[in-house]
Amino acid sequence: DRGYETYNIFAHVQEKGMYYLIRVKDGGGGSMTGSFDLPDENEFDHDMQLILTRKQTKDVKAKPKKFKFIAKSSPFDYLDLYDKKFYTLNFRVVRFAISEDSYESIITNLPKEDFPVEEIKKVYAMRWGIETSFRELKYAIGLCCFHSKKVEYIMQEIYARLILYNYCELITMHVI
């Protein structure tokens, strides 16, 4: 969910040949999309190509829509100051209505041909089951607090709680 929108995460997934679909803050100050050149519409599906760099040359500064400066303090594993000076990131920004006056913005590298906006909405909606499961695991089952200090015992607690969660889900499926 929100909070995962970093160029470093996008690049790691892209380098592994995998796909991502990440919700981002919807426009304005403090949002990743606030600096993008996006359509002036409520809903859109816009292809983006950014060239990330740690260099602040005249060319980079003159083309802020093409280049994105990454500060040295921001982690990005595919750039350095000497050998790898530029990294190209390709993705889509998809914005769609979730209610009459509320919108969600998604950044994804899923192919547009296979995943039009309606499919993106469906995939985005699928995450709710996963999110509610994590909430149950953290709070109802107690996965946010451990009693052990050693790694192997913490792992044992995690597995025990996962088994308990799955057992509880199995029981509730047959009762309800």
What residue ranges belong to the model's regions?
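Single, function-defining residue in the core of a domain
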Residues: 2-176
